[in-house]
Amino acid sequence: MKETMMETLSQRLNALQEKILEHYEQDSKLIYDQINYWKYVRLENAIFYAARERGMHTIDHQVVPPGTTSKAKAYQAIELQMALESLAQTDFNKEEWTLKDTSNEMWQTKPKQCFKKKGVTVEVWYDGNKDNSMHYVVWGAIYYKTHTDTWCKTEGYVDYWGIYYVHEQHKTYYEVFKQDAQMYGTSGKWEVHCNGNIIHCPDSMYSTSDDTVPTTELTAELQHTTPAHTAATTPCTKKTKSAPSCKCGVSRPSETDGVFVDLVTSKGCNKRRHQCCGDTTPIVHLKGDKNGLKCLRYRLRKFNSLYENISCTWHWIGGKGSKHTGILTVTYTTEAQRQKFLETVRIPPSVHVSVGYMTL
């Protein structure tokens, strides 16, 4: 009975993970495909949760996560799936929606429980010191839900006091610089650097003792516009003109449709293994979303003749590393084997490929 249950769960899990990996490979920009992705993730974690409840610790050589982990991920998937299904019922469904745009990391980034696109970095120097600075993001497009369950689209703006968007004629700040100034600074003053413009605090503004964000703004106008504020199907409350704000020019770096490949070699090394810094092994680092890498590693089993070893998913800690971005390391016996691997295996466009060497 237990073997039958194991086989059933294994078949369902394999089918779901195949669909998840196909989604990564397609690199779709349709909102309906992103809805399906989160449905697959929800079902995948439901299987893991059910397996753990039945005392299973592995399914077809895959480690079953703790029940609390699977439950939390399933809830995340449900939340994203429902939000996207709601958004898909509006005219915003005609826009491009990538896996990054609809990721849980983006959903939980400030302002939380909003979809966001086209981020631009703003640098704040506390005490006017560049070495004591923090980076924040102004979003060129913010999609939020009103109390009437209407999806609206607006833009992010920055002034001396923080970063905000306008909702029903009211500013909603999602970053307040004064709070961080109390934590990181000593003078209580700071400078906002955005697209080559600097926003300072005049003495008249600094003299206020109120902890709330003042209604009188100190802003620098980079573009002569007022915050855009549109609804998908029914109009939001019309916005009145306000003081000019700093809207950082929003642009996205161009992306190619293929896989990014970096060649990483040690200084002075030759491409041939027997000439490269002694006894080294050709490797490939596959960097991307952890869940996608897990599915990719599962699929790579059928190409096991094209590599020597493959690691579990890992990530850097500290520095510029991110716990949300995973890395798979694949080793090869020869450079020819590695080249055959890269020519044969289809790597999803969202996965960054780095080619290099390791001493093992």
Curated annotation (Swiss-Prot):
SUPFAM superfamilies per the UniProt record, alphabetical: E2 regulatory, transactivation domain (SSF51332), Viral DNA-binding domain (SSF54957)
GO MF entries: DNA binding; DNA-binding transcription factor activity; nucleotide binding
Pfam families: PPV_E2_C, PPV_E2_N
InterPro entries, per database record: E2/EBNA1_C_sf, Nucleotide-bd_a/b_plait_sf, Papillomavirus_E2_C, PPV_E2_N, Reg_prot_E2, Regulatory_protein_E2_N, Regulatory_protein_E2_N_1, Regulatory_protein_E2_N_2
Chain spans, region Transactivation domain: 1-206
Cross-link (Glycyl lysine isopeptide (Lys-Gly) (interchain with G-Cter in SUMO)), chain numbering: 287
Oligomeric and partner information: Binds DNA as homodimer. Interacts with protein E1; this interaction greatly increases E1 DNA-binding activity. Interacts with protein L1; this interaction enhances E2-dependent replication and transcription activation. Interacts with protein L2; this interaction inhibits E2 transcriptional activity but not DNA replication function E2. Interacts with protein E7; this interaction inhibits E7 oncogenic activity. Interacts with host TAF1; this interaction modulates E2-dependent transcriptional regulation. Interacts with host BRD4; this interaction mediates E2 transcriptional activation function.
Protein's UniProt name: Regulatory protein E2
Naturally occurring in which organism (per UniProt): Human papillomavirus type 70
